[in-house]
From Swiss-Prot:
Enzyme class: hydrolase
Region (C-terminal short (CTS) helix): 173-184
Enzyme Commission designation: 3.4.21.89
Primary localisation category: endoplasmic reticulum
Superkingdom classification of source: Eukaryota
Reaction catalysed by this enzyme: Cleavage of hydrophobic, N-terminal signal or leader sequences from secreted and periplasmic proteins
Organism per entry: Ajellomyces capsulatus (strain H143)
Function (record text): Catalytic component of the signal peptidase complex (SPC) which catalyzes the cleavage of N-terminal signal sequences from nascent proteins as they are translocated into the lumen of the endoplasmic reticulum. Specifically cleaves N-terminal signal peptides that contain a hydrophobic alpha-helix (h-region) shorter than 18-20 amino acids.
Name the UniProt record assigns to this protein: Signal peptidase complex catalytic subunit SEC11
């Protein structure tokens, strides 16, 4: 077993360089993600459409770019939101905007900013999303539930992530292949 590692032990500088290059790639990707998060004011500035509920506007596997710096959302706008207690982003269209209702949360009503309340629906769905919301929730809160509004998309490119989540063995194969490429890379 140790004999297979001998080419890497013979030149530790080269091995260290490869490990550092791999770390640089990972940290650069993380920095780009965090920079996009700060610029767009969204915890997830890029999402993949996971279902066909927004067809024909967006197909399953489309990659969406979000923006969450607009103070208000309009009827007809396509938004991405998280349901309380679930971690799956949902992409749907705003069907109705309710009047702003200030929620005090134990503070003075005068010092509390009102948050927009929204009702959403998938273009390909028959009814609104109230069944998808958390139990007892009748609408979405703009500040707490929304991840952002869709500002752009790339068709079908996100299908890779769907394949990786539906077929876990593909993830192992891909990670193994990437690790092998890093180890066999010669500079």
């Amino acid at each position: 077993m140790l004999s297979s590692l001998s080419p890497y032990m013979a030149n530790p500088r080269n091995t260290l360089s490869q490990v550092l290059n791999f770390g640089l790639v990972l940290s650069s990707a993380f920095m780009v993600w965090k920079t996009l998060s700060v610029i767009t004011n969204s915890t997830s500035p890029v999402v993949v459409v996971l279902s066909g509920s927004m067809e024909p506007a967006f197909q399953r596997g489309d990659l969406l770019f979000l923006w969450n710096r607009s103070p208000r959302v309009d009827v007809g706008e396509i938004v991405v939101y998280n349901v309380q207690g679930k971690d799956i982003p949902i992409v749907h269209r705003v069907m109705r905007v309710f009047p702003d209702v200030p929620t005090t949360g134990g503070k003075d009503v005068e010092s509390v900013e009102a948050s927009q309340k929204l009702l959403t629906k998938g273009d390909n769905n028959l009814s609104d999303d109230t069944e998808l919301y958390a139990p007892g929730q009748e609408f979405l809160d703009r500040k707490t539930d929304l991840m952002g509004s869709v500002r752009g998309y790339v068709p079908a490119i996100g299908y890779v992530t769907i394949m990786l989540s539906e077929h876990p063995w593909l993830k192992s194969v891909l990670l193994g292949f990437m690790g092998l490429m890093v180890m066999l890379q010669r500079e």
